């Protein structure tokens, strides 16, 4: 609605996990470095955690664009499965043609595939997002898959991505064998206050239709400060506020987004949140 008014080719503050908008904050870059290290060194199991809206899925999608050509991946987004369904999803996402419908048969087909890919010099990575939703039995299944190996290397690298509750799940006594196999961990924190203005301007720059024209959208310093306080540095909340602010600016026919506009947008978001929870 407001894109043409502001000279934008797309909405800069969508809450979807678009890697084109990846912002290299200190913590996000550290997260990418941990993932690249864990995969390249074939560490086996890697755990990436962060609160809701901190950019975990965006980091994973950006990571997929950074890995070398010999890295092949399967990306499971919502693992609310049974053990059989999880295996079916992994086999399907790796592009494996399997006529087996039993758990043992699919593991056999997966192992054969991993061995062939290893001989070809490829590194296979399984990413499971929202892994805090995995029941203990499924996490044990993941551990067993991570056991697939040659004399020298792990055949499958596993990245578990989830909210902090994932750590609580992994600390269960029955999952102690899995916990001992986690070789790389990283927790994504919020953006620093000084990064928030850079983050906003970065997304506006990516979305700008004419790169040779100066960005005509201006958030005042007071507006940025209020966004920082309300969002506590959480990218998703920053996006929600800024998207509403651009709409409010469009309705008011202004490119200058000040404290008053941001205050109204935050009040609307708070009101909506209260209504949702009523």
Segment roles from a protein language model:
Residues 1-42, 275-278:
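A short, basic N-terminal segment
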Residues 11-13, 70-72, 81-100:
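Conserved NTP-binding/hydrolysis module of P-loop NTPases
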Residues 41-63, 79:
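Walker A/P-loop nucleotide-binding motif
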Residues 62-66, 166-181, 190:
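Short regulatory helix/loop adjacent to the ATP-binding pocket of P-loop NTPases
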Residues 76-80, 169-170, 183-196:
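Conserved AAA+ ATPase "SRH/arginine-finger" region at the nucleotide-binding site
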Residues 82-85, 97-141, 150-154, 191-196, ...:
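Mid-core helix/loop region of P-loop NTP-binding domains shared across ATPases and GTPases
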